[in-house]
């Protein structure tokens, strides 16, 4: 299904909030052709894919209980360019965590990621926008058993405490994967690498595991590959004598 088809498929669904109130998807107004033309200037190729243009004409987003709102026009609002050079901020949970759609240098609308600040983890949430809409529908129906809630409550902690999603540069250089090797060779020796290419949803990495300073983080220009500086913690003597 296209995003528009997926959204239309859930418009008649009825959900029940935690307070027992019934609710439905509430669409926001769509954009005019001129508004879409203005919006696409912010994209790498200066163009919006046809299926996204269709969606934006239909609606610019929708209201849904449990999310601040789902917004299809939040281009460049998120920041965090070290990890997502071009993105659409789709939704927030009201606590400083966001669902962000990644757009590559060719203007392709790709995966949706859940970006959490506490713990500081990035998770592949949905393969594409249509699946994200499906996951929102599932959240309304299944609550704590939904993909959205499991990632929000469980997956981020698993990545932070059990598997931080990184490999050492030496491991990447020893790989037979040429793209991975080439990316690793471009990084300083004290960097670690996360590779989410072809990884299933709920895969991710602990972007803040080595401290909150991400100014030196690097993203591959076309692949789901990231490099993060691994800052070694200094011992007491090193701190005292500046070594």
What spans do the regions from the language model cover?
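A surface-exposed partner-binding patch
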Residues: 1-108, 148, 160-243
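Alpha-helix N-cap recognition
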Residues: 125-131, 158-165
């Amino acid at each position: 299904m296209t995003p528009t088809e997926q959204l239309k498929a859930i418009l008649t669904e009825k959900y029940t909030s935690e307070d027992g109130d019934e609710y439905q998807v509430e669409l926001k107004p769509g954009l005019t052709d001129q508004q879409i033309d203005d919006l696409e200037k912010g994209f790498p190729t200066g163009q919006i894919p046809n299926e996204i243009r269709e969606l934006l004409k239909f609606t610019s987003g929708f209201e849904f209980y449990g999310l601040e709102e789902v917004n299809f026009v939040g281009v460049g609002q998120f920041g965090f360019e070290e990890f997502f050079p071009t993105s659409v901020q789709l939704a927030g949970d009201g606590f400083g965590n966001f669902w962000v759609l990644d757009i590559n240098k060719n203007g392709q609308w790709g995966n949706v990621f859940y970006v959490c600040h506490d713990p500081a983890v990035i998770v592949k949430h949905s393969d594409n926008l249509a699946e994200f809409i499906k996951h929102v529908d599932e959240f309304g129906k299944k609550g704590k058993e939904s993909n959205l809630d499991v990632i929000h409550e469980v997956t981020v902690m698993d990545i932070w405490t059990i598997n931080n999603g990184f490999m050492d540069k030496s491991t990447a250089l020893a790989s037979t994967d040429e793209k991975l090797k080439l990316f690793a060779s471009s990084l300083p020796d004290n960097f670690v690498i996360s590779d989410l290419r072809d990884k299933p949803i709920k895969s991710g990495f602990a972007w803040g595991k080595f401290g909150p300073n991400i100014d030196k983080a690097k993203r591959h220009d076309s692949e789901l590959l990231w490099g993060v500086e691994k800052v070694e913690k200094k011992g007491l003597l090193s701190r005292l004598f500046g070594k």
